[in-house]
Design a protein with these regions (language model features):
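Active-site loop/lid in soluble adenylation, ligation, and acyl-transfer enzymes
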Residues: 1-120, 231, 241, 246
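Residues forming anionic-ligand binding surfaces in small-molecule and nucleic-acid pockets
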Residues: 27-36, 116-144
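Short beta-strand elements
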Residues: 27-28, 94, 187-194
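A short glycine-rich, hydrophobically flanked beta-strand micro-motif that places a catalytic Asp/Glu
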Residues: 71-75, 166-180
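C-terminal helix-cap and adjacent tail motif
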Residues: 110, 192-249
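Phosphate-binding core of ATP-grasp and ATP-grasp-like enzymes
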Residues: 110-127, 158-171, 193-198
Length: 249
């Protein structure tokens, strides 16, 4: 049962449940970019992301990846395990795009083989800075063993999700993951969605992700709806769902 509101991030609100080991992730319709500097509301966006995330988390679980996801409980919300989150973001890049293009001087769209893995400190006030294992060790964020395990799982996740999208003629350009501990074991947490991945049409290279909003490249709702359609997800957005998003936050 959904209880008190615990906290809100950029696009989700977290609620307690009757079980102290479980939480509810409520996907809101807020769109943010550039560390919250650009903001907008896209009605129904949270519903698309909740459905896509549930689908991908199920795929990962089927392949033996331990995730926080338990079940989708309605159009906007999912029940998950409560993790002790690690304050790092693990990024996997299959194709050059975003910050790596400027930072390393790569050409946008260049394939990266093997994939490049990057670490970022999860800190909104600092803009989630790019770091390496030496920072992790010195600042005692977590152990080097946990980082190595998370990076290994990240590549496994990459193989599974890339295959899912390749089958629908979409390139998985890059994505970020977050991890947490549960009873001493490492679990994949947070979400996997067009808000946390770059997804390009294989032929046209048209994006179907949050870059549509970041760089004013098109309609976000259309892009997310297209991903749902390609994945075979039947997503219905009605007035009650939209009202619920505002009532719960």
């Amino acid at each position: 049962m959904k209880k008190e509101h615990l906290y809100s991030g950029k696009g989700k609100s977290i609620f307690a449940t009757d079980n102290p080991n479980h939480i509810i992730m409520h996907f809101r319709d807020d769109l943010t970019a550039f560390n919250g500097e650009k903001k907008e509301t896209c009605l129904g966006k949270g519903i698309y992301l909740n459905n896509i995330n549930a689908f991908l988390m199920d795929k990962l679980a089927q392949q033996g990846v331990k995730t926080s996801f338990i079940e989708k409980i309605n159009q906007r919300e999912s029940l998950t395990h409560k993790l002790d989150m690690i304050q790092l973001e693990f990024v996997v890049r299959n194709i050059a795009a975003g910050t790596i293009v400027k930072r390393v001087g790569l050409t946008k769209g260049s394939p990266l083989s093997p994939p490049i893995q990057e670490l970022f400190l999860k800190n909104d006030k600092l803009g989630d800075p790019f770091i390496n294992i030496h920072y992790v060790n010195s600042l005692k964020i977590t152990s080097a063993e946990v980082v190595a395990q998370a990076e290994k799982i990240s590549l496994q996740v990459n193989d599974i999700i890339k295959d899912v999208f390749t089958k629908i003629n979409i390139d998985l350009v890059d994505f970020k993951l977050e991890f947490g501990l549960l009873d001493g074991e490492l679990y994949l947490g947070d979400e996997i969605s067009p808000d946390t991945c770059r997804l390009w049409d294989q032929k046209s290279k048209r994006p179907f992700d949050k870059d549509l909003f970041r760089f004013d490249l098109g309609d976000v709702k259309e892009g997310y709806d297209r991903i749902c359609e390609l994945l075979g997800l039947k997503v219905t957005i009605d007035t009650h769902d939209l009202q619920a998003d505002h009532q719960d936050n």
